[in-house]
Amino acid sequence: MYHTYEPTSWYSASYMEGTTEEWCLSTTKKGRICDIQIGGSDSYAMYGPVYFTKEFLAQFLPKLGADYARPSTKEHYWEHTLLDWVKTGKPEIYINRQPKDQVYEFESLEELRAFDPFYQDHSDNMAMNLISKVFHVSQSEITDICCLKAGMTNQSFLFRVKEKRYICRIPGPGTDMLIDRRAEHNNYATVAPLQITEEIVYFNEVTGYKISVYYEQSRTANFSDIEDQKKAMALLRKLHRAKLQSNHSFDIEERILFYENLCTSHGQEIPFEDYKKIKKNMMQLIQDISNSPRPSVLSHVDSVCDNFLFVKKGDIEEVKLIDWEYAGQADPLIDIAMCCIYSYFNREQSDELLRVYLEREPNREEYATLYAYMALGGFLWTLWAIYKSHQGENFSDYTLVMYRYAKDYFHYHNDVLKM
């Protein structure tokens, strides 16, 4: 396909019969690509490798860099930039038509393994090597591999070994600076007697790789459903009333200062004009909390609805709480606060969730504490998202929503104390 001398830039293309979701090309009589449409039928489509001349790159790379720096286009494929570029006609890029079965694209390891049996046992992949060792099987016995939706911290994929499915967690970029995996492992060991977590098959404190059992008949919590709320809060009550003691504390002030330092030490600007004022408010909340005697027990801290797993067993659903990487000793009401802000609850919804958890009407101190942790949680995850966004991740409006919690619930906290 490639030659010693290539006179022009080109994109490989294969003919697609019938309807396709591939990127279809329109060309001039001389083969210059003049338009790209996402999806089409009975057309040549972008498929396989691409070649750029130095002259093309000299003009194209600045445009590509500008699109990457722009929030509205940062998450695009690089071909989106090309799509806009070809309409101008300069510099030129041509179609490189390939015969049928000349070019293959592989979207996953499973597709590659189906095409070339060599990769069934020689994937050259760290996760596959690990699974092979953990289960004492050849890589060819690891099947049905598919990616799961990426979380906000990690990526995971599903696989099957000996007719049973498992999940392998791969820590996301930069998480080694954010997560203490030894503490996470200790959290699982501490909470094990309650039998409320996912079943862990393998955990590596150094790499953060984790393999756990996949529950076939399961779903995540829906916090707009009052019955799901009740079951999730019942599990949190069970956790908190056990009064488990971990060797690791979740100190929200320390975490706030830690993430702030991560942002500023990497030359990142915190993009809020009133940041210093809001931070001062958060320090006041921390002082208020420290002046109030509150219990400290093992708490989950990352109590987003997706971490409550409803597993069907016969005619009942058993609730499990997964992913304990942020857990530590803390005020149990921090778990309720995190449930609220992760679910984007308003004040009325948050008050109701607190009632469900306590199984009674909260007192003034409990309302004030909930609002304080909602504000502090919002502030903490704002800094977390700012840092992660500078690592190349995109959280849409999440950062703004969390910052709004910090601002609003500071005032709600103070209003309650004045009552």
What are these regions (language model features)?
Residues 333-362, 375-393:
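Active-site activation/catalytic loop segments of kinase-like enzymes and analogous catalytic loops
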Residues 92-199, 208, 297, 311-319:
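Conserved NTP-binding catalytic cores of kinases and kinase-like/nucleotidyltransferase enzymes
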